[in-house]
């Protein structure tokens, strides 16, 4: 009577619309590569969210300010330093943030606004006309960053970007402020810094600029580095983030079907699986441009989080040695989009903003609920062949005993990879019972193929591994 081991890191099923095989990704569960009880890894629920404070509105952006050793967060119409208000921010959309020795900058409503640490607020504008310095057509600010002693920002709808003056950050550089990413005639979509380079992200190329070291009045301070240019573009202003000592981004449909890439030494490496590309392809270019990417690290997980209008996708670099490992985050018992955004390590905890309500939260590892509400966790096994076999003892290793009350695990089976049948309820957690078995003794006879779905609804953390079944 052979015992078959079933992986839980990624299920396999079929798409009923086109008969293609697809991946069933874990929902609210992270894979951890660690030898546990004859398994090469286990799956752990994504940390829960507890309320931290009330704020002025939904989250619009966050940055860790190294000059002040504090987290600056834009929520609603306010700028927060930690949990205290320090300024008003116009508009309601996503904002870009950067900081320097004297100010925290926010790119909002086409302006670069500097919230100085002495309490004053300045907006970047041209020098007075009687100063004798060059007057620039500054236009509308699209994205901002900072390198060394200067802020840099891209001008919306053009291939131009500007730098601020060294002495007065509220004005462009008095002699050489304007530069152009000439490979991007449709305009710079986003701007960032990598090591000592300014990085300009367009729709079809990514261009790098380095300091020239020139000291002559009027000489160019930055020059393009064509050896580092990448022949891919980004989908939207916030569809990029620093990740793994480089940048990760969602590619623009201008360079083919969108995917997720990591830049490395003038080349790009794809990290998206076919199922992730199918999800990205389901969005139009305009909707995909509203995506937001961020990175997060905890407990040896290196996470890349992609917030899309209908999905939140997570790539875990630490468990992707045998192929890209993705999972899906969601809120509630249905397919509502995950509500937390703008994660950042603050003090000794990870804090986050919210997409739905005027609150900030913090990740807690001893719960899986979100603001006190139960969450659904889904795992799938691949389809496997069991021709005319009788199946017994479907068992999952579970780390139990921490629940406040008895939780149940819902098991269901599919024979076609599309439809899952009636759910079998099995107790999978109980207070202080640390060695509880999760066991379905009599599964039944299998005609041809079979796959299983595991569903847990709980407020407690979930840890599952080692799914096995006995065949006769």
Predicted regions and their residues:
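Residue-level signature of beta-propeller blades and closely related beta-rich strand-turn architectures
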Residues: 77, 110-111, 157, 204, ...
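Acidic surface patches and DE-rich sequence motifs
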Residues: 65, 116, 155-156, 202, ...
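Hydrophobic or amphipathic alpha-helical targeting/insertion segments
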Residues: 96-131
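Beta-sheet repeat architectures centered on beta-propellers
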Residues: 1-102, 231-246, 253-472
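Beta-propeller and closely related beta-pinwheel folds
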Residues: 47-58, 84-93, 122-292
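Residues that form or flank phosphate/diphosphate-binding pockets in enzymes
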Residues: 107, 201, 389
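Short beta-strand segments and strand-loop junctions that repeat across beta-rich extracellular domains
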Residues: 113-117, 154-172, 206, 312-320, ...
């Amino acid at each position: 009577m052979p015992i078959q081991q079933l992986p839980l890191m990624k299920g396999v099923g079929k798409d009923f619309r086109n008969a293609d095989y697809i991946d069933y990704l874990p929902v609210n569960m992270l894979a951890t590569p660690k030898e546990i009880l004859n398994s090469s890894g286990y799956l752990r629920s994504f940390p829960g969210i507890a309320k931290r404070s009330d704020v002025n509105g939904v989250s619009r952006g966050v940055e860790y300010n190294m000059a002040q050793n504090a987290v600056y967060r834009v929520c609603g119409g306010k700028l927060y330093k930690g949990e205290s208000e320090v300024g008003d921010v116009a508009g309601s959309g996503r904002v870009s943030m950067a900081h320097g020795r004297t100010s925290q900058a926010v790119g909002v409503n086409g302006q670069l606004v500097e919230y100085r640490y002495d309490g004053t607020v300045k907006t970047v504008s041209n020098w007075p006309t009687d100063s004798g310095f060059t007057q620039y057509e500054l236009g509308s600010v699209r994205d901002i960053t900072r390198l060394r002693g200067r802020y840099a920002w891209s001008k919306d709808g053009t291939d131009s970007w500007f730098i601020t003056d060294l002495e007065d950050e509220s004005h462009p550089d008095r002699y050489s402020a304007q530069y152009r990413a000439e490979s991007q005639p449709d305009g710079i979509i986003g701007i960032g810094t990598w090591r000592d380079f300014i990085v300009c992200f367009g729709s079809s190329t990514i261009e790098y600029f380095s300091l020239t070291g020139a000291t002559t009045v009027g000489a160019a301070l930055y020059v393009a580095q064509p050896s580092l240019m990448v022949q891919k573009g980004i989908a939207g202003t916030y569809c990029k983030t620093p990740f793994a000592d480089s940048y990760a981004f969602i590619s623009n449909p201008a360079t083919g079907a969108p995917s997720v890439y990591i830049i490395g030494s003038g080349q790009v490496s794809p990290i998206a699986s076919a199922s992730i590309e199918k999800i990205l392809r389901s969005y139009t270019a305009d909707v995909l441009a509203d995506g937001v990417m961020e990175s997060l690290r905890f407990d040896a997980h290196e996470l890349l989080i992609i917030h899309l209008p209908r999905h939140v996708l997570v790539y875990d670099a630490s468990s992707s040695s045998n192929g890209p490992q993705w999972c899906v985050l969601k809120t509630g018992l249905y397919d509502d989009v995950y509500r937390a955004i703008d994660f950042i390590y603050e003090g000794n905890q990870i804090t986050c903003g919210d997409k739905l309500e005027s609150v900030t939260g913090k990740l807690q590892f001893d719960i899986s609920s979100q603001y006190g509400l139960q969450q659904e966790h889904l795992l799938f096994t691949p389809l496997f062949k069991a021709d005319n076999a009788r199946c017994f003892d479907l068992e999952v290793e579970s780390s139990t005993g921490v629940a406040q009350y008895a939780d149940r695990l819902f098991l269901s089976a599919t024979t076609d990879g599309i439809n899952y049948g009636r759910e079998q309820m099995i107790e999978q957690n109980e207070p202080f019972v640390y060695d509880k078995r999760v066991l379905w003794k009599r599964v039944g006879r299998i005609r041809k193929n079979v796959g299983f779905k595991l569903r847990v609804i709980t407020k407690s953390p979930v840890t599952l591994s080692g799914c096995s079944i006995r065949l006769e």
